[in-house]
């Protein structure tokens, strides 16, 4: 009971009473700490009846008058905000950074050489690519000669294939016998016996 009596005078008499608050900060209601009077600026009141169709308002900066979603409409005399240039403090203090001038690339110009020296240009390119000739000793093959040689090889292969029937294998020359005869003549002495190898699926598969 003594604990209740000791606590009673601290808390119970303050129940329901509001705390005292400071209504004004020290020094008055203004935030001026130096005591000088602030200049009173007149309040701007917008004239809502004034028309701004033909000219931008003098007091206000550039603004968007009507906005509807992504579409923005500008009246005569107004300019979009994107046109305003932002002032960078670095460029204002140190000037514009100097950028190296790069020449413009002509994208319409063809990279294929035309004219009479196409063979010489192709030969020069092949000569300088790897620093050595293109597989043939003492000669540089150009693109046109490689194309013509590849077409000749195709003609020769197609001619040899047309002699026989690829399905049955009839009419083809037996290449293994020619190969064994060549080796006999080259060695001169003992003939080398080569076994004829049959491809998987036989000769009638069309792959061989």
Swiss-Prot record:
Chain intervals with Basic and acidic residues compositional bias: 82-93
Location(s) in or outside the cell: Nucleus; Cytoplasm; Cytoplasm, Cytoskeleton; Cytoplasm, Cytoskeleton, Spindle
InterPro entries: JUPITER
GO cellular component terms attached to this protein's record: cytosol; microtubule; microtubule associated complex; nucleus; spindle
Residues modified as Phosphothreonine: 41, 98, 102
Superkingdom, natural source: Eukaryota
UniProt KW keywords: Cytoplasm, Cytoskeleton, Microtubule, Nucleus, Phosphoprotein
Region (Disordered): 24-43, 82-106, 132-208
One Pfam family from the record: JUPITER
Tissues with expression: Ubiquitous expression throughout development. Expressed during cell division in the syncytial embryo. Expressed in developing photoreceptors of the eye imaginal disk of the third larval stage. In adults, highly expressed in neurons of the brain, concentrated in axons. In the adult ovaries, expression accumulates in the germarium and the polar follicular cells as well as in the oocyte along the microtubule network.
Transmembrane residue ranges: none
Main location as per UniProt: nucleus
GO MF, one annotated term: structural constituent of cytoskeleton
Modified residues (Phosphoserine): 30, 111, 139, 150
Compositional bias annotation for Polar residues: 151-165, 178-189
GO biological process terms on file: positive regulation of microtubule polymerization
Amino acid composition bias (Low complexity), ranges on this chain: 137-150
Record PANTHER family: GEO05313P1, MICROTUBULE-ASSOCIATED PROTEIN JUPITER
Cited function: Binds to all microtubule populations.
UniProt family annotation: Belongs to the MAP Jupiter family.
Protein name (database record): Microtubule-associated protein Jupiter
Upper taxonomic lineage: Eukaryota, Metazoa, Ecdysozoa, Arthropoda, Hexapoda
